[in-house]
Swiss-Prot record:
UniProt biased composition (Polar residues): 237-246, 329-352, 359-379, 799-812
Family label: Belongs to the protein kinase superfamily. Alpha-type protein kinase family. ALPK subfamily.
Protein's name according to its UniProt entry: Alpha-protein kinase 1
Keywords: ATP-binding, Coiled coil, Kinase, Metal-binding, Nucleotide-binding, Serine/threonine-protein kinase, Transferase, Zinc, Zinc-finger
Originating gene: ak1
PROSITE patterns: ALPHA_KINASE, ARFGAP
Family annotation (SMART domains): Alpha_kinase, ArfGap
Positions with biased composition (Pro residues): 906-915, 1321-1332
Zinc finger (C4-type): 25-48
UniProt record, GO biological process: myosin II filament disassembly; protein phosphorylation
Coiled-coil stretches noted in the UniProt entry, renumbered to this chain: 393-429, 689-781, 1241-1320
Organism: Dictyostelium discoideum (Social amoeba)
């Protein structure tokens, strides 16, 4: 990932990004960190960047972004490690478990941190800390304690007095006068030290306050200017870290000034040269101060013999710009300290505190980030090192301090009473928190919050035990009195170190001296420095390591009166100076100490330098002071500096005696340290959280394993169940097969039995037939048979194999022979007249397959045959059929009655041979006695010969067809239609094309119930008009197969055929070679039927029925000229508005046409509009008749093609004159007018013109749509206005419509003029534009007038 290469801060940003501590997200520990949040000063992953952006933080990507110096300083001062340690000090996994990186609950966790401020709710400002106040000072008043004191100080170099307890009297009033301490944090807390007076009078104990000792300061220390804090916007989210603008980075000498920023009363110290050869009792006086992060392992006993006492003054306006999240500067701006004495220069050996502060050396500890020094920033979060300071203090300095304090006691006794009163008032008032703001807010201090989470949690179980041990030790000390107080102090102090320090192993107390002391009840100790000590007046009570990266100073303004103070002040002239480890990242600053036990500091580890003095102080330089050298600090295990190493792990020290720099081991607290195997290391809450997660994962794995085992068991059970089911299914299937086999065997047996029975029955039937045929007599039918009042049509079905001129030859059907009879053309039995007889026939039909056909044995069958013959004779007498058809049908009835014919397979139909009729049976029912008919008879000899031949054929075929199924003849026969049966009265509707209306007349008709032909949509029935005579009485009724068809369809079809007839008449006026005509059609309303149904009726046409074209471009193979020319003529005759197609009929007499209109409206379902017109011309070829009529040439036939009808030569080339007027109703159906067409040579130009017209029409339509939209908008605006405005709009719309109409009329007139000028009319090859033509309705004229106009 590379930012902008041209960025001047590119190198710093690169080193920050390559830091291992910044490689993981500061919020979720994800490995991908392509984003940064400048406000928080951390590197984050894309998921956390998204969540933080939703919470109001500004997030920017590293790739392609530029960073200012302030942004880089922000990232340097904080970084991911500081941020993580800050939150770990406040948050524990026991409170709320941090979600993993991919968990959606991570957003709610971040919301708790930054929006709801769950763990930082006690902070006063949006940054989590109180705002800085540069002028805020707190005065620490003089704390005076009245007591009896002795001024006798014996400076004897030879006396040895180790029993100081006998000479301990009431202590002097030692006043620690602090005034005008201006401690200014770097934007964190305003530190105010309140006046607290703690008096504790114990017998035989030192009772006094901390001794105020003058400190060496810079004489001309200028206050550093503090930048004004900039208010942060509230919408950008909460940040616990301050802006780098208000956080100056102090150097090392500034940090020391912060610790010694007290202004005690100046004391004139005498320059006394004391020879201290062996003055390192319980102290490391020869150790140089180095900011090395630890304490050297061995002590140097060589001390400086000459010490100089200097008097310095401090600036009251001294400021402490300390940023807890900023690293310590490695080099000060001034470069060195100035010596205020002027008489003696500072030591240049580099071993003193001043030399190191004035000439700092670069730390030799390796950078944890591994970044080269040239690329590493000056202040980096990973290079944040907190150094431990060794405080060199000698006995001579102690004596000088005591002398100065005794001189100050006299001056301070006068002010004691006033101070006590002030102290009492302050004790009654609540103690202010030094880390809270001046607004008296209840927010909890930062350092106490940081220490309280971890230290209380880890060391709470030590409190009761330590308190009990301390009480026992105090009681024993009081009982013993003056018996070896130094030994008691050393033992008790060592026990306290071993018990109170959680970082020192309890099993090895001898390795850890008494330099560590834990104060759980706010007991304090004073570090008394010599006159030449640079940190002489610092009273450091608690220097506690904390898991928080923030500092924790604890300035004690008074000494607690707890019993432990006696232990701290019980040494006789011994310095008891331990190397106090000053962890500047964990300094606990306290305004005062109290005698009450406080849990806020019970977990703090106090590392104090206790200097015990009494009124009679014997300072011994030469003798017996070496006895206390056993208390030197050797093999120290130091507390790890924060924040780089883990504060819960010990820091190994270097064994190099020359170089006292202790290199801290960088330990990442967020990762497991597998190399540390110590048993006494205290477990971090994060490690506990990791263990909990591991336990949860193990439990989840166990649960998953259990679930998998359960699933496997379930699957096994399912497999077993499936196998059992399959076995059951197989058994069941086998049983079913066995049952089926048994059933089949039984059926076969039954069939064999039935066949045997049928054979016996057939033999019996043959014998009976022979007997009956011998007894039959011939019945002669005559035309004088009485006519009965029949209500139904007697017309039987025309046989399909007959050669009648009225039947279509394509519907021939052959059936297999029935029973053992010889094969003959199977004839469909005629249907009875009455409905009852028809039902009886249907009931008898299922018995035919079971038994072979038998001759008629009952009187019912004979009656049916007789009635059919009588009805047939009646129709013949009424001239409804000719003699040939009559004879054919009569023979059919006789053949069906006698069963003497058989069908012939796969042979074309042959004309029937003249067969004499067979006499009807003699038995005739009484109600209808049969009448004999005059006609020829058949001799009995011929009849016997035929019977013998039939018997022989039956015997030959009987064996082959015994098991063949017998078909039902009635199943293939058309069923009669109940709508057309018998004779009835009807109303005939005839359309008059001249008048354009329907005319109704009443008549009587007789129809047959069964159709003689069927089409795709309709059935054809025979009908006769009894009111007419001759051929006009023969008609055909056409009914739709769908009884729910709309009635108006019949009227539309008749109307369309009437229009075609009118166009055919105009076609005949052109004198074509053959004239054409359309059969007149009517609509019959059957008023006597239920529901009064309608049917289309037209005159019957005799001859061969042919179809020349259809409504979708079909053309007959013969391609006659006249029908095709008529369709072409109808298109141009109608002004290119319609075309007549679907020409079919007999000869040139056509019927059932179809009309395509340009608008696609009207003329029934077959009207295909423009598409139908295009289909016709796609297959049409202009023939000579088209040229004769003067029609436009479209795909003309070759000139040498002389097939078809040819017109007369003189008439070729004549132009067709369109009639001036059309029938009124026909004119109404023409809703579009097509533009004139030119010759076929300019068809391409026409196509272009048509396309141009189409584009114009589209533009017009678009304009109209736009106008409509504008009108709609206007209407919406106008609806809100008054009614008057609405009326005006309506008038405007009317005017627009009138203008449009006028424009359309003008266009139509122009088009008509162009049509008259042009002669050619070729049909279009592309879709014609639908330009409507509105014509005025002409007056109704007589057909004769129209003919006159046409002729003229």
């Amino acid at each position: 990932m590379q930012p902008v290469p041209s960025d001047p801060n590119y190198g710093l940003l690169r080193s920050l990004f390559q830091d291992p501590n910044n490689q993981c997200c500061a919020e979720c520990n994800s490995a991908n960190v392509p984003y940064v949040c400048i406000k928080l000063g951390v590197f984050i992953c894309p998921t956390c960047a998204h969540f933080l952006s939703t919470l109001g933080f500004k997030v920017r990507p590293i790739m392609g972004s530029s960073f200012s110096e302030e942004d880089i300083s922000r990232l340097q001062s904080i970084g991911n490690l500081v941020s993580k340690q800050f939150w770990l000090a406040r948050w524990t996994p026991m409170d709320i478990v941090m979600p993993p990186p991919e968990d959606p609950n991570l957003e709610s966790f971040l919301r708790l941190k930054y929006i709801e401020k769950r763990w930082t709710s006690s902070l006063s400002t949006s940054d989590g800390f109180s705002s800085p106040n540069n002028n805020n000072t707190s005065n620490v008043n003089n704390i005076n304690n009245n007591s009896n004191h002795n001024n006798n100080i014996n400076n004897n170099n030879n006396n040895i007095n180790n029993n100081n307890n006998n000479n301990i009297n009431n202590n002097n009033n030692i006043i620690n006068n602090f005034s005008n301490i201006n401690n200014i944090s770097n934007g964190m807390n305003n530190i105010s030290l309140n006046n607290i007076n703690n008096n504790n009078n114990n017998n035989n104990h030192y009772n006094g306050n901390d001794i105020g000792i003058p400190i060496v300061h810079k004489t001309q220390s200028q206050p550093q200017p503090q930048p004004q804090p900039q208010p942060q916007p509230q919408s950008q989210g909460f940040s616990p870290f301050n802006s780098p603008r208000s956080s100056p980075k102090p150097g090392r000498h500034h940090l020391i000034d912060d610790l010694i920023s007290f202004n005690p009363t100046p004391v004139n110290n005498s320059n006394n040269n004391n020879n201290n050869n062996n003055n390192n009792n319980n102290g490391n006086n020869g150790n140089p101060l180095k900011f090395s992060g630890g304490i050297p392992q061995n002590n140097n006993n060589n001390n400086n013999n000459n010490t100089t006492t200097t008097t310095t003054t401090t600036n009251n306006n001294n400021k402490v710009p300390f940023d807890p999240f900023s690293p310590i500067k490695t080099f000060s701006e001034s470069g060195e300290y100035q010596n205020t004495n002027g008489n003696q220069q500072l030591s240049g050996s580099g071993n003193s505190l001043i030399d190191i502060l004035s000439h700092p050396t670069q730390s030799k500890s390796p950078s944890p980030s591994g970044t080269p020094h040239s690329l590493s920033p000056q202040h980096h979060s990973s290079d944040f090192k907190v150094h431990l300071i060794d405080i060199p203090t000698t006995q001579q300095q102690l004596q000088q301090q005591q002398l100065q304090l005794q001189q100050q006691l006299q001056q301070q006794l006068q002010q004691q009473q006033q101070q006590q009163q002030q102290q009492q008032q302050q004790q009654q008032s609540p103690i202010s928190n030094p880390f809270t703001s001046n607004n008296n807010s209840n927010s909890e201090p930062l350092v106490s919050i940081l220490d309280k989470h971890e230290d209380l949690h880890n060391h709470h179980h030590h409190q009761q035990q330590q308190h009990h041990k301390q009480q026992q030790q105090q009681q024993q000390q009081q009982q013993n009195g003056n018996n070896s107080p130094l030994a008691q102090f050393n033992q008790i102090q060592q026990q306290q170190i071993n018990n109170n320090n959680p970082f020192v192993e309890e099993k090895q107390p001898h390795q850890h001296p008494h330099h560590l002391q834990h104060h759980r009840h706010h007991s304090t100790s004073s570090i008394n420095h010599g006159s030449n000590g640079d940190l002489a007046s610092i009273s450091l009570t608690l220097l506690t390591p904390s898991p928080s990266p923030s500092p924790s100073f604890n300035y004690s303004g008074g000494v607690s009166s707890a019993p432990n103070n006696s232990l701290n002040n019980s040494c006789n002239g011994n310095n008891n100076l331990n190397n106090g480890m000053l962890n500047f990242s964990n300094l606990n600053i306290g305004g005062s100490t109290s005698s009450a036990c406080s849990t806020n500091s019970s977990s703090n580890i106090t590392i104090a330098n206790n200097i015990n003095s009494s009124n009679n102080i014997n300072i011994i330089n030469n003798q017996n002071n070496q006895n206390n050298n056993n208390n030197n600090n050797t093999n120290n295990v130091m507390i790890s500096p924060s924040p780089s190493p883990n504060p819960f792990l010990p820091t190994p020290t270097s064994t190099n005696q020359n170089n006292h720099i202790i290199t801290p081991i960088p330990v990442n607290p967020f990762t497991d340290n597998l190399q540390l195997n110590s048993n006494n290391i205290r477990q971090h809450p994060q490690q506990m959280y990791i263990q909990q997660q591991q336990q949860q994962q193990q439990q989840q794995q166990q649960q998953q394993q259990q679930q998998q085992q359960q699933q496997q068991q379930q699957q096994q059970q399912q497999l077993q169940m499936q196998q059992q089911q399959q076995q059951q299914m197989q058994q069941h299937y086998q049983q079913q097969q066995q049952q089926q086999q048994q059933q089949q065997q039984q059926q076969q047996q039954q069939q064999q039995q039935q066949q045997q029975q049928q054979q016996q029955q057939q033999q019996q039937q043959q014998q009976q037939q022979q007997q009956q045929q011998q007894q039959q007599q011939h019945i002669n039918l005559s035309s004088s048979a009485p006519l009965q009042s029949v209500n139904h049509s007697p017309i039987p079905l025309q046989p399909q194999h007959s050669s009648s001129q009225y039947m279509n030859q394509q519907g021939y059907q052959v059936y297999p022979n029935v029973g053992n009879q010889p094969q003959s053309p199977q004839q469909i039995q005629p249907q009875p007249l009455q409905q009852q007889i028809f039902q009886q026939v249907q009931q008898q039909q299922p018995q035919i397959p079971q038994q072979s056909p038998q001759p008629l044995q009952s009187s019912t069958d004979e009656d049916q045959s007789v009635l059919e013959v009588l009805n047939l004779k009646k129709l013949f007498d009424m001239n409804m059929m000719d003699k040939e058809e009559f004879e054919h049908r009569r023979r059919q009835i006789i053949d069906n009655l006698t069963k003497t014919t058989s069908p012939i397979h796969q042979q074309p139909p042959q004309p029937p041979q003249p067969v004499l009729p067979v006499s009807a049976p003699a038995q005739v029912p009484q109600p209808h006695p049969p009448q004999q008919q005059n006609g020829p008879t058949v001799p009995q000899q011929q009849q016997q010969q035929q019977q013998q031949q039939q018997q022989q054929q039956q015997q030959q075929q009987q064996q082959q067809q015994q098991q063949q199924p017998i078909p039902q003849p009635s199943s293939s026969s058309p069923t009669p239609d109940a709508r057309l049966t018998g004779t009835e009265r009807v109303i005939r509707h005839r359309f008059d094309a001249k008048l354009g209306k329907w005319v109704q007349t009443a008549t009587i008709v007789i129809t047959e119930p069964t159709p003689f032909a069927e089409g795709a949509m309709r059935k054809a029935f025979r009908m006769k008009d009894l009111s007419a005579e001759g051929p006009s009485s023969q008609m055909v009724a056409k009914l739709f197969k769908d009884s729910n068809e709309d009635r108006m369809v019949y009227f539309k079809d008749v109307e369309m055929q009437t229009y075609s007839k009118e166009i055919a008449e105009r076609f005949n006026l052109k004198s074509p070679p053959k004239k054409i005509d359309f059969v007149p059609a009517f609509v019959m309303e059957l008023v006597e039927r239920q529901g009064k149904p309608f049917c289309a009726v037209e005159y019957f046409i005799e001859g061969k029925y042919e179809k020349h074209n259809n409504n979708f471009g079909y053309k007959n193979d013969y391609d006659r000229n006249t029908p095709q020319a008529f369709s072409h003529f109808s298109y141009e005759d109608s002004g290119c508005q319609l075309i007549v197609v679907d020409i079919q009929g007999v000869g040139d007499v056509y019927t059932d046409p179809q009309i395509h209109s340009a608008d696609g409206q009207g003329f029934g379902k077959g009207n295909l509009g423009i598409e139908g017109i295009k289909r016709f011309f796609s297959t049409h070829q202009c023939n000579p008749i088209c040229h004769y009529l003067g029609l436009s040439s479209v795909n003309p036939k070759p000139a040498n093609d002389e097939s078809g009808t040819m017109p007369r030569p003189p008439s070729i080339g004549q132009s067709y004159v369109r009639p001036s007027a059309f029938p009124p109703n026909l004119q109404q159906s023409f809703s579009f007018n097509f533009p004139p067409l030119k010759d076929h040579h300019v068809l391409e130009q026409l196509n272009q013109q048509q396309q141009h017209l189409q584009q114009q029409q589209q533009q017009q339509q678009q304009q109209q749509q736009q106008q409509q939209q504008q009108q709609q908008q206007q209407q919406q605006q106008q609806q809100q206005q008054q009614q008057q405005q609405q009326q005006q709009q309506q008038q405007q719309q009317q005017n627009q419509q009138q203008n449009q109409q006028q424009n359309q009329q003008q266009q139509q007139q122009q088009q008509q003029q162009q049509q008259q000028q042009q002669n050619g009319h070729p049909p279009p090859q592309t879709p014609l534009p639908p330009t409507p033509q509105q014509k005025d309705k002409p007056k109704i004229e007589v057909f004769g007038d129209i003919l006159r106009k046409l002729v003229s």
